């Protein structure tokens, strides 16, 4: 029997799923962070209100930022899976580098290349390409 390892999920489902998870992670983490920060920066009698207001104003924005990152990363990852016809850690490493470069291209070529190297390195640490199987 010839069984090839196929992609776990269809491309669009995979990308939309990553966007949703990234938005949720950013919104929850942003809510906690901005609540604590807002409560700390509020006067003594209004700490709860200040924290709630800061979280409700800033958490969706951070969730959206995470969603863009997750969507680009997943899109590049799926594109590499389709081009290379295999799933391995190199896809996520290159996708992370491409995502880092695209997200910081507005700051110039030097910043984009630095960001690409850093994101690629970060994903190489998370998904080591060489190791035990």
Curated annotation (Swiss-Prot):
Location(s) in or outside the cell: Mitochondrion inner membrane
Topological type in the membrane: Multi-pass membrane protein
Membrane-spanning ranges: 15-35, 63-83, 90-105, 115-128
GO cellular component: TIM23 mitochondrial import inner membrane translocase complex
Tissues where this protein is expressed: Expressed in cotyledons, roots, flowers and leaves.
Induction: Down-regulated after antimycin A or rotenone treatments.
Keywords assigned by UniProt, alphabetized: Membrane, Mitochondrion, Mitochondrion inner membrane, Transmembrane, Transmembrane helix
Functional note: Essential component of the TIM17:23 complex, a complex that mediates the translocation of transit peptide-containing proteins across the mitochondrial inner membrane. Links the inner and outer membranes.
PANTHER family: MITOCHONDRIAL IMPORT INNER MEMBRANE TRANSLOCASE SUBUNIT TIM-17 (PTHR10485), MITOCHONDRIAL IMPORT INNER MEMBRANE TRANSLOCASE SUBUNIT TIM17-3 (PTHR10485:SF15)
Family the entry assigns: Belongs to the Tim17/Tim22/Tim23 family.
Subunit structure: Component of the TIM17:23 complex at least composed of TIM23, TIM17 and TIM50. The complex interacts with the TIM44 component of the PAM complex.
Protein name, per record: Mitochondrial import inner membrane translocase subunit TIM17-3
